[in-house]
Amino acid sequence: MFDRILKYILILSNDTLSILEIIIRLDCDLIKYEIIDKSDGWIIIESEDPKIENAFTKLGGIFKVSKSNTKSIKDLDELNPEILLSELLGNQLNNRKLIWGLSIYSNKEHDLNEINKTITESFKKALVALGADRNKLIRSTFARFEGVSALEIPSREVTNRLLPPSGAELIVINSKNRIHIAQTFRCIDHLDFRNKDFLRPHQNSEVSMPPRLARILVNLSGITKSEVLLDPFCGAGTILLEAIDLRYNIIGIDIEPEQISKANSNIRWFSKYRKITLSKSEPKIFVGDSRKLESYFKEDSIDRIVTEPILLPLLKKLPSNENASKMLKKSASTYFDALRSMVKVLKPKGRIIMVAPEIKTLDGQLMRFPLESRITQLGLKEYKPNLAQNIQYPIIVGTEIKRALRNIYVLEKN
């Protein structure tokens, strides 16, 4: 048995996609946990498994992780700030000049200012009483997510000033029936993801997938250390780099020799950046046709496939309905032929993470491939973990102000 049950609050960057990533990652790592609350902007998890904090380091779809060994409260009248801060901050209270701040997330916008004022004033007095009499408060700013309002401190500032032991950010979740308070101990490493995007030798921000999204997709595959991940449209290797970063075995294929050269160059750079020693036989990256995967691999031999075929032209402006339809129709056969080939080489119960485009047209319509109609025909089904049975595919990433969105599917072979 483990020492104690801890409560973890994760602030999400992609709502549905982030929650799905967390569930699949924890299930894949055989972590025992319970979801006690979730919303568009956060998820609250209880666990006594010490491995869970390492699992959180693998995620791409979060901003912050906080934890608490304290109980939630029904309302602010139940708040005992001295006891709460003593339990959360411990030895940090020995620092008279403690730098701290509050980030408050709520389903009810009208409660934000009242909660902020009440907790800020009570915590200031409690910190003085507990010995941090020269503490400094970092102010939060208003933000709005879909369905969630917040007074928050940006994760970059938390990373720079408010992580233990020198600082303390306290996360307050005002949920439907309870108020949860926890201390942030980890933020997403924005700089590292940015470096992986812009410092590598070859990148194209106009069409390449952001490394954070690639990390999420790798996690959605549910891959384990003994398995192999294939990207049959690998391009310059964005997805492959994230899989390598998590120490997974990878295979990359692209029909363009120039893209394979770029992918190999990026991987060599990444091995030096991350100080990873790659054997001469790994990774396996070669020129090949994604529509003929059975020419390179045995049937039922690949564990996981994660890919984003980029077959549409770069859209400089919104197309007409007619032009959008033509573009989709022109590339549809390649998508479906490749998907059919993927199914042949994929192991039973193996998973395909497929990204397909959705185009916004001049008159505001959104047009995409009829992928759903082919899934069952090819012997696939939408993958829904036990704790996410109500999820709806595709999961859309991006906003409608963009000319093209990403539709994400998590599919499993029967």
Identify the function of each model-found stretch:
Residues 124-148:
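A gly/proline- and charged-residue-enriched helix-loop-helix capping module
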Residues 2-79, 83, 87, 108-117, ...:
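Class I S-adenosyl-L-methionine-dependent methyltransferase catalytic core
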Residues 96-99, 226:
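Phosphate-coordination loops involved in phosphoryl transfer and adenosine-cofactor binding
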Residues 102-106:
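Active-site nucleophile-His-acid catalytic modules used for acyl/amide transfer and hydrolysis
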